[in-house]
């Protein structure tokens, strides 16, 4: 199969993932900004990763937050924490990222991270020139319903790139499902945190490195 477009997830694919404790501390800081210094640990956990609109509504009701303001502040605080991780050298690109410079197809990014974080990382690591489009989430509660496996942002990227035969590369099962929902092929990349991962989905390709894309895209 020859692909004319490749789209990537960002965290865990192009750059290293942010440690969970960093995200949790940033979420705790968000509560503190609203005057809550001892929130229920379960509420912090719910707001750290994978929050749903209903969970945001529940937490906001418990602490008398305005939901959109709380979530906007949470996203901003978590983004700033990730930016600091990058500046400190604790969140860095994977070593095989350079191989994409020779991949002669239009490329894009679709991440469930904040748009602010995606934009910062592209600029900070000076890799924005590799990609023709890049989508993250807006800092809104509605964006939580548009995360992968919803193909919303992926379909926007494919439209930007005028893709006819596209491949989406990810490190999560939600990435593979998003590709399926968008009607395109997928590649699951076996980064160290996924080396022994047992999949419950069926990607088109199972790869160890971004280098593998050269053979795949010309197969």
What does each of the following model-derived ranges do?
Residues 108:
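Extended substrate/RNA-proximal surfaces in nucleic-acid metabolism proteins
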Residues 2-102:
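N-terminal helical cap/lid subdomain that shapes the substrate entry/recognition surface
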Residues 111-113:
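Conserved phosphate-coupling serine/threonine residues in phosphotransfer and NTP-handling enzymes
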